[in-house]
């Protein structure tokens, strides 16, 4: 590809100082391109961070009213604690190079930042991803977990567990990263987990799986005979609001994972650039979620006989979780297949959870772990060669099995699923078990029955009227009683006042 200097040289005609002039102009273009890319990444980070509001609304609507304030507070805690611990340790473990492929060891407390390839905008973007994983887990253990346990697990997940996984698959020297610059690629391919079906969703889902399993189901979720007792969330409106906020944020989550937008593929002046890939990624994301929502709508109608908005919202999010790995390397038609299958994966996981008496109030484990795992496999089947080579910059890479690319990518992705499940189980499973053994994980039965809001947070999240309104109403009623003429039954019948 011709450089800026090569293109400008002939235009300047070899005039005096033409080289200096060309250098100046090219540097200005480079600065502008860097500014555009930084703005794009920051805007994407803001969108991903806005997903925390979506998580909060979705969680609040999916639990009972007596626990709504508790679950919203945990979402605030995930963001706040995650910011501190990802700043101190997490970013260093995730992207500190050089390393031996397992864990980073530079940038603790953002020391030596910024430098080439790692600026503050990149830290902000990655922090927003880290707290998304923690938010997934909080939904699985809702309505029965001590608030102190949230603080402990959130700090551990965002500061250590999640960063190690992201180093493996996203760092430039991670042992399984498709973008690895030093050392051999896993199966000569590396793992293509573009925006985190495995790194974010499978990690958060497996962590939630262990938390919910060790805690056990909520009181009353299953009766003495083992039959399921419905515990519906208190607000479908909040669920829908949260779902749309998450959909909006996913346009930063998936397309934003390019981290730049001004990169050119091929010769300058063509339409073949990263901006086109960004647009295609947004399309595949929307299609996968939309098809999953429609499939869930009619699938649940067929199974249960009614239309359920909460099921549709979860199906939509399941499609998003699945397409996240391969959103940049598959065609739009393939994303339709991804969404269709992800809906049935979610329905099947929900059926299995009831059989096993597994209680996840938000279906977070089924949605993020189940659909995330499917998304990893889907990418290994449908990744297109041209997109893989353009995005990862190396010709001859393995690509999707169904697209003629062989089985190397599929083998790498199976390894990804296995190591994530093993790592998160060993770390988060152990943490939840230790908290359980020391009585720090689950609230008392009395607290759970009464509700987390009145027992732990000073009152209910919803108040019909405040104390001042009650006093005004009582005073008005008393004054009315004093001035209103009273009638005896006989006088009332005769139309006379006392």
Curated annotation (Swiss-Prot):
It is a multi-pass membrane protein. Gene3D superfamilies: Ammonium transporter AmtB like domains. InterPro entries: Ammonium/urea_transptr, Ammonium_transpt, Ammonium_transpt_CS, NH4_transpt_AmtB-like_dom. The lineage of its organism: Eukaryota, Viridiplantae, Streptophyta, Embryophyta, Tracheophyta. GO terms for cellular component: plasma membrane. It is found in: Membrane. Belongs to the ammonia transporter channel (TC 1.A.11.2) family. The chain crosses the membrane at residues 41-61, 76-96, 122-142, 150-170, 194-214, 238-258, 277-299, 307-327, 329-349, 362-382, 414-434. Signal peptide: none annotated. This is Ammonium transporter 1 member 3. The keyword Transport applies. Keywords: Ammonia transport, Membrane, Transmembrane, Transmembrane helix, Transport. PANTHER family: AMMONIUM TRANSPORTER, AMMONIUM TRANSPORTER 1 MEMBER 1. One of its GO terms (biological process) is ammonium transmembrane transport. Expressed in roots. Residues 473-498 are annotated as: Disordered. One of its GO terms (molecular function) is ammonium channel activity. It comes from the Eukaryota. Ammonium transporter probably involved in ammonium uptake from the soil. It comes from Oryza sativa subsp. japonica. Induction: Down-regulated by ammonium or glutamine supply in roots. It holds the Pfam family Ammonium_transp. Its main location: membrane. PROSITE patterns: AMMONIUM_TRANSP.
């Amino acid at each position: 590809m011709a450089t800026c200097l090569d293109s400008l040289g002939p235009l300047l005609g070899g005039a005096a100082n033409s080289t200096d002039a060309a250098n100046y102009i090219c540097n200005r273009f480079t600065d502008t391109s860097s500014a555009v890319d930084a703005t794009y990444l920051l805007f994407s980070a803001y969108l991903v961070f806005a997903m925390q509001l979506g998580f909060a609304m979705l969680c609040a609507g999916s639990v009972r009213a007596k626990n709504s304030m508790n679950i919203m507070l945990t979402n605030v805690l995930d963001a706040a604690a995650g910011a501190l611990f990802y700043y101190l340790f997490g970013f260093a473990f995730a992207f500190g190079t050089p390393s031996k492929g397992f864990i980073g060891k530079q940038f603790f407390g953002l020391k030596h930042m910024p430098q080439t390839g790692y600026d503050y905008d990149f830290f902000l973007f990655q922090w927003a991803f880290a707290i998304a994983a923690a938010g997934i887990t909080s939904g699985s253990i809702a309505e029965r977990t001590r608030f102190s346990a949230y603080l402990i697990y959130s700090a551990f997940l965002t500061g250590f567990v999640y960063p190690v996984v992201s180093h493996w698959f996203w760092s430039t020297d991670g042992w399984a990263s498709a973008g690895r610059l030093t050392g051999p690629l896993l199966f000569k391919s590396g793992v293509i987990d573009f925006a985190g079906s495995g790194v974010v969703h499978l990690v958060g889902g497996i962590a939630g799986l262990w938390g919910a399993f060790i805690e056990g189901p909520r009181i009353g979720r299953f009766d003495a005979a083992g039959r399921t007792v419905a515990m519906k969330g208190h607000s479908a409106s909040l669920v829908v609001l949260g779902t749309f906020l998450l959909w909006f944020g996913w346009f930063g989550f998936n397309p934003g994972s390019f981290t730049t937008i001004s990169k050119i593929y091929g010769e300058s002046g063509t339409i073949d650039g990263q901006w086109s890939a960004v647009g295609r990624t947004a399309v595949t994301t929307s299609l996968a979620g939309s098809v999953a929502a429609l499939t869930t709508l009619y699938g649940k109608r067929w199974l249960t006989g009614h239309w359920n908005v909460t099921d549709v919202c979860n199906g939509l999010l399941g499609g998003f979780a699945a397409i996240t790995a391969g959103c940049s390397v598959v065609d739009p038609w393939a994303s339709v297949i991804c969404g269709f299958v992800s809906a049935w994966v979610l329905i099947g996981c929900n059926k299995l959870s009831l059989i096993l008496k597994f209680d996840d109030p938000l279906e977070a484990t089924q949605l993020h772990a189940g659909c995330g795992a499917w998304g990893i496999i889907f990418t290994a089947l449908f990744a297109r060669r041209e997109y893989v080579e353009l995005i990862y910059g190396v010709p001859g890479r393995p690509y999707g099995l169904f697209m003629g690319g062989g089985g190397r990518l599929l083998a790498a992705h199976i390894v990804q699923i296995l190591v994530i499940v093993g790592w998160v189980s060993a770390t988060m499973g152990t943490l939840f078990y230790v908290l359980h053994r020391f009585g720090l994980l689950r609230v008392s039965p009395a607290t759970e029955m009464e509700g987390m809001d009145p027992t732990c947070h000073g009152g209910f999240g919803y108040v019909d009227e405040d104390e001042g309104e009650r006093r005004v109403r009582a005073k008005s009623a008393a004054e009315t009683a004093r001035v209103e003429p009273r009638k005896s039954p006989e006088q009332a019948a005769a139309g006379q006042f006392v």
